[in-house]
């Protein structure tokens, strides 16, 4: 069996690189880099398939990459010509934010603003532990600084708070007592 290793560009890169010279440098560089990556991927996949004797699959892979390359070039052309996009100096393209424009004259914008004013996006309120519960927690802390889960549940029942609150209280109390020492 004879292996054929392909090193020549298989997607007509000379023609494509000639076209790149007429474009501005940002989009030309983006386009050229995309073409290079796709051609390198195609070359390595085709070589691997040909090495194992799968010539039919290699042809299908080539067609797939040709379609990917055409889609890539179409996307670059759309970005260059479309008013929806701006190019950045570092070579990336972003779509302009049109959310506010789309939301104008709709109730969504009013609801959104009302939600901001009414504190819909505030974090959860702190759970307050009553003074009587704090006394019980202090007593339990003096007895044992690291209660296990069963002890935390018992303390939580006695205090009328959740076991999670008990666990957090003990963690915070240990940290406070450590920093004071």
UniProtKB/Swiss-Prot annotation:
Q: Name one GO molecular function term.
A: DNA binding
Per UniProt, subcellular location reads as: Nucleus
DNA-binding region of this protein:
122-181
* Cellular component annotations (GO), alphabetically ordered: nucleus
Q: Does the keyword Transport apply?
A: no
Location (main, coarse): nucleus
Q: Does the keyword Transcription regulation apply?
A: yes
Question: In which domain of life is the source organism classified?
Answer: Eukaryota
Q: Which InterPro entries match?
A: HD, HD-ZIP_Homeobox_LZ_Class_II, Homeobox_CS, Homeodomain-like_sf
* Keywords of the record: DNA-binding, Homeobox, Nucleus, Transcription, Transcription regulation
State the family it belongs to.
Answer: Belongs to the MATA1 family.
This molecule's function is given as: Mating type proteins are sequence specific DNA-binding proteins that act as master switches in yeast differentiation by controlling gene expression in a cell type-specific fashion.
Quote additional remarks. Answer: In P.angusta, all mating-type proteins (MATA1, MATALPHA1 and MATALPHA2) are encoded on one idiomorph, consistent with the fact that P.angusta is a homothallic haploid in which any strain can mate with any other strain.
Spell out the protein name for this chain.
Answer: Mating-type protein A1
Species assigned in the record: Pichia angusta (Yeast)
Q: What's the source species' lineage?
A: Eukaryota, Fungi, Dikarya, Ascomycota, Saccharomycotina
Gene it is expressed from? MATA1
